[in-house]
Every structure is written in C-alpha cells, then in structure tokens.
C-alpha cells in the first residue's frame, strides 16, 4: 500500500497495469491508498471508498488512451461530516512537481532521504487533494 501521486504515476506498477489496459482499449482504473507508515489498512473502509469512486466514474466517458488514477487519503486526515463520514471525491490533475533531491550516504550505499509527505505540491492537484484528506480522482493519458 502507498500513494501513487504526482510523478509516482511514472514509476508505479499499479498505474502501469491501468496504463497497459488503456493501451489495449480497455477502461481501467488504478487505485492506491496513501497512509501513515504505522497505520494498518482498514479494508472495509477502503472498499466502501472505492465503491463510491467506481459508482462515480461508471457514467464518465474516457477517451481512447485515457484511464483513471485514484488515490485514497490516509484515514487519519479524511474529513468527517460527509456521507457516512467518507471523504469527498475530487477530480484533479496529476501534480507534475518533482521530488526533492535529497540523498543520504549509508554503509549500503546512497539512499533517497526526502520526506514523502513534505514533497512539493500544487494546490488543486492530486498530491494536495489526497494529503488534504479527500479522494483524488485523476484522468490520465497513455501518451
């Protein structure tokens, strides 16, 4: 588990599967759950959130070569007061901001050392939406 936000879409196997399906003309969606490191996944809650997303995108049109990328927020940051306490689903663009370039030398070699949650983000894009406690729904293109 983990988010596939922003530039993660270029590295993610989850997103690659949806992208490959789109290449073959299939409707597809990649779903990821951002969460704190020590937090266990609440599969019942995640299933409920995904069911809401699927109901929403079922009626939306995708152009050839498009697919959906969905990021569920950390339940600890999801706002209360929505239907069933569930977070809103917000359509947004994928954030193009690069990760911070911070590496630490260790006995095993160089390791990326930037803080994932403190990554750069643009307001209204998937990283900010998901980190703000809402479900980020992004339309992506294969090429």
Task: Label every PLM stretch briefly.
Residues 1, 31-34, 72:
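Active-site-proximal beta-strand/loop segments in catalytic clefts of secreted hydrolases
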Residues 43-143:
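Electrostatically charged, flexible surface regions
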